[in-house]
Amino acid sequence: MARKTNVFATTAGILATGGIIGIAACLLQKFGNPGNMGLCVACFGRDVAGSIGLHRAAVVQYLRPEIMGFVLGAFAAALLFREFRPSGGSSPLVRFVLGMIAMIGALVFLGCPWRVFLRLAGGDGNALAGLAGLAGGVWLGTLFFRKGYSLGRSQSQPAGSGLIMPLVMLGLVALRIFYPPVPEEAQNGLLWYSLKGPGSMHAPLVLSLGAGLGIGFLAQRTRFCTMGALRDVILFRQGYLLYGVLAFFGAALAANLLLGQFHPGFSGQPVAHAQWFWNFSGMVVAGLAFALAGGCPGRQLFLCGEGNSDAGIFAMGLLAGAALAHNFGLASSPQGTTSHGMVAVGVCLAVLLFIGFTHCPKQGGQA
């Protein structure tokens, strides 16, 4: 019945949502966001972590309004359509760790699943390895699903619990308004800002926040999720979410061609490196973490807007992972992956396998 009452949850709805996200990403790039990074939840989360002082990497510090918009837009949709249902309590510490690991893997690759497709749509051939890694990581996750993997059931919670993340995001919007970036100043009040590098590149506040709000609203209604698209095809042979991802890529490719932002090649791509093995491995780690957590980083933010505190814990893990990645030198750069990052990929994969096996009933874990 839900599919009948939700006009967005149709093939046309998911195609439109994917297309709008792809076009919005390219336009945000045109208006100032970094190259092939018009929208990237991992990279933008890293910038947010830097802006509030969780790491001191000076080139990636900016309070990205798109992130707050995703949660607040989804919150508005959930309220309007009576889908704001506060819940949580499903292995919160595990979800926090999954969030940290997902961010570390994404920063080894230099992008979340959304940026995999945006890099491809911008002509970055290195993202092919990332796409293969993402698919491989999600496929590994489906092996655990077949064995009964579960983090336990979420429980209904008081309204106050579900309001925490939207209120936090509203507070961050207020901070961005009252403490805007000041030319040639690395700090304004409570917030840090990059003077060069990706963090210094951003679209105007109104456009960024507006795009985030609109995307959050649409994605909440359609359940847009890049990880879910791959999972559903592998497990159930269902293409609903995949249609949205394909529309996202197709629209971004078309927009980049029209805007002159398509630059095919492997070297000199913006905020990217050409080490294929580590592009692949980083996204295997990220993809498996997203699968075990139940959604890509964008989907997790949209769930925060619905009052899901488990998704909120995962989002906090993303911020912590960004801080660790830059404070400990795990994040890659255009020059390539660091030695610490290489070790981190192996350690993170081992932790993910441990979580997967110990949460499968057939392996002695809890259902």
Region annotations inferred by a language model:
Residues 1-367:
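Membrane-interfacial helix-loop segments of redox and metal-homeostasis proteins
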